[in-house]
Amino acid sequence: MSQSVLIVDALGAGKGWRTRSRDVIGAGPRTVASLLESDYEVSLITYEDLQKLGLDSVMDYDTVGVSIMTGDERAARRMFDHTRSRTFRFIGGPGAADPNALLKTGADAAVIGEAEETLPELLEERGPVRGVYFRRGTEVDFPGPRPISRRFTRVNPEYIRAYAHRWAARVYVEIVRGCSNSCRTTFELPDGRKCSGCGNCREGEGGERWECPEGIPPGCGFCSVPSIFGPTRSRPLNEVVREVRGLVREGIRRVVLSASDVLDYGRGDLLTDPRTPPPNVEALRRLLRRTSKHVDVLFVENVKACLLNREIAELLGEYCRGTSVSVGVETGDPRLLRAIGKPSTLKEALRAIRLLRRAGLRPHAYFVYGLPGQTMKSAKLTAKAMKRAVEMGAEKITVYRFRPIPASAFGDFPPGPSPRNDEASRLIADTARRLNEALKRRMIGKRIRVYVAEPDLRRPRDAIGWPVKGGPKVRLKGARELVGTECEVEITGVVSDKVVSGKVVRILEEIDVEALEGRGVPG
């Protein structure tokens, strides 16, 4: 009899349940479950559902793997504390790149980045292998990195059944792995590493751009994707379409084509230049045409501003009209942009927002406060850039506090100062809040389609609507009984810079959620 493996999606569950992006289902845990299903009895569950069953349920499995982000270590620890002594325990996901996560969670091993080659070997050996941090008591072994893989797992769409609100969620489907940004930060790192100005990462050719004589990780300093997943490579189109079709058969209505930059799709193999060659228009057209014909609503995740032009914007608008799309601006200070390793300029980012808006999409502009090198001058420039982004058509300004991510160039920097304690961070955060509240007020009186997805966690008699084409969550007073429907709602007010209130105008569709819930998860 084959051994049993439980994969737990604990992404964002540090407090015991997800409080943000509850309408998002990532690709990672489903990919890992699919990778192992031919050799093991695999089950997939979310951390929230596992708590409802009882954490003691993990005792039934020979191996337990948990997908985490930084901040989810406590959730993993609580699970692992309920396993038997002979159970093999591992972590994966973005949080696994920190060797300290092994000690915080009590896991035996942490899979860094891609699982295709690493995880099967790890479960066979149950010992140190390349691409894994392995714990021995309070010591951590690292046999070394594993070369990047060109292999993509064939994802079993049936694993989406592990997610209770899948019918209303935005389900991510991987189309590109890695990142093409070879640029590096020019800031001196805490351990003394500093750019020597050799020019390889910005002016070199091919693989030369990926090599840094000073050992500085590639990519934007705050991001670990290039250093963990390597240069960009595209997933075969037939595999993408196969997964999308399978998800639709499972009741999925919204799909997000997931990539560090959708415009890298089909642009080349093992791409190390974020600017050239230009996007492969025909490859993108085939991707969008063949996926959009199967699903109700198609999103693209991210676009690099330096690759976007009017032709590409109009192509995205043709197949994804009315949906939200992310543009990373990060800061309004041109000097800081280059210093953190960003390949796009501020001018390019603002132009991309304008082009996307004109093409019928709803761009969201992303900024970071507390970055290394932040000054009051850079904060003022960032506040100005936020206002310009709104003028160019940004529907939302998203701001994040800089937090060091393991395996990124800035991984050893301290977290950025909070708005409470720092005037520059406060200026950026307050500007974003005011702009977002003003943008939400523009919505009052408008009618949109939402999926009434779940009761309000704070007001159980109310319900939360997830806008069909993306946007702020809609609080619907007294609408708990409408959970499981698609409705047209009128926006009536602004609750916060992230939530609006609304009233139901009419029910468009009653969805047979019970039939979907009755389908068993593979395993």
UniProtKB/Swiss-Prot annotation:
CDD domains, sorted: Radical_SAM
All copies of domain Radical SAM core, residue ranges: 193-447
Record-linked InterPro entries: Elp3/MiaA/NifB-like_rSAM, rSAM, rSAM_horseshoe, Tetrapyrrole_Bchl_Biosynth_MTs
Record flagged with keyword 4Fe-4S: yes
GO MF, one annotated term: metal ion binding
Keyword vocabulary terms for this entry: 4Fe-4S, Iron, Iron-sulfur, Metal-binding, S-adenosyl-L-methionine
Binding positions for [4Fe-4S] cluster per the UniProt entry: 212, 220, 223
SUPFAM superfamilies: Radical SAM enzymes (SSF102114)
Named cofactor requirement(s): [4Fe-4S] cluster
Protein name as it appears in the record: Uncharacterized protein MK0932
Organism: Methanopyrus kandleri (strain AV19 / DSM 6324 / JCM 9639 / NBRC 100938)
